[in-house]
Amino acid sequence: MLQLDEILANATTAIETAASLVALDEVRVQYLGKKGELTSQLQSLGKLPPEERRTAGQEINKAKGAVQQAIAARKDALQRAELETKLAAETIDVSLPGRRIENGGLHPVTRTVERIEQFFGELGFSTESGPEIEDAFHNFDALNIADDHPARTDHDTFFFNPDLMLRTHTSGVQIRTMEHGKPPFRFIAPGRVYRNDYDQTHTPMFHQVEGMLVDENVNFAQLKGILNEFLCNFFEEEVEVRFRPSFFPFTEPSAEVDVKRKDGKWLEVLGCGMVHPNVLRSVGIDPEKYSGFAFGMGVERLTMLRYGVNDLRSFFENDLRFLKQFK
């Protein structure tokens, strides 16, 4: 009992000097725990004479209450200090200059595809898609491409095996769409295509948009009118357009379409023609009843012309200095 004042003084000092909640809890255990010093004092009351026990018990409980209050007060102070430190660390200096958040922008190729889709969508053309890994029937056979055509060689096409390849055009989408429907058809097919070529004007992967219209009494004059209107709309000016006779296995007659540049030179921008009867037959459509036209354009080529880009490879190098120009 004679140690009670000393225990209380030591406990008070330990509580006041506890620098953290963990240290404070250690003090609590030391004095108030099951084996704590004040708890031991209570347990030793039985050794005192009966007449002294009550007074001693009251003194011990009084000391115990004082320690509990001191611990509670110190705990509250430590928690407030911890919160203040945390808030101070999270304080925002409103006088600091703000961080500029860069706005993203559409890739120029995406812009071109969306512009093409919008124009033809207004003419009633739907947008179709298909697999990028294509079989020989949809990529070559159904399109009237002969077995000895150069496109069937490894020099032009990425083959997985003789009957499976990365598609070289989106024409396969035209075949698949006609296979699963009945005329009339009016759609475009944008997408990635692959050819074994890489230089200033060619990349192994590029984008194409092909279009097709199949119905009764479709003629070449309608094709010319639509493409002429499209090119003027795309370049946002009246451009001079010419159609040159050409050859494509899947169209007959066929033509290449050129636009006249400001320097007076002609530049090819797309190919087109009337759908070959063999293509219609390959999907079970009677060429005596139905006719159609088809066209195809390289998206990167049109994008280069629209924005004055000289090297097609710039579109795929992810150089932000280049891409920021198109925001």
From Swiss-Prot:
EC number, as in UniProt: 6.1.1.20
Residues that coordinate or bind Mg(2+): E252
Pfam families: Phe_tRNA-synt_N (PF02912), tRNA-synt_2d (PF01409)
Family: Belongs to the class-II aminoacyl-tRNA synthetase family. Phe-tRNA synthetase alpha subunit type 1 subfamily.
Localization per record: Cytoplasm
The UniProt record lists the keyword Aminoacyl-tRNA synthetase: yes
The protein, known as: Phenylalanine--tRNA ligase alpha subunit
Any single Gene Ontology cellular-component annotation: cytoplasm
Keywords on record: Aminoacyl-tRNA synthetase, ATP-binding, Cytoplasm, Ligase, Magnesium, Metal-binding, Nucleotide-binding, Protein biosynthesis
Catalytic activity field: tRNA(Phe) + L-phenylalanine + ATP = L-phenylalanyl-tRNA(Phe) + AMP + diphosphate + H(+)
Main location: cytoplasm
Cofactor descriptive note: Binds 2 magnesium ions per tetramer.
Native source organism of the sequence: Photobacterium profundum (strain SS9)
Gene this chain is encoded by: pheS
Disulfide-linked positions: none
Superkingdom: Bacteria
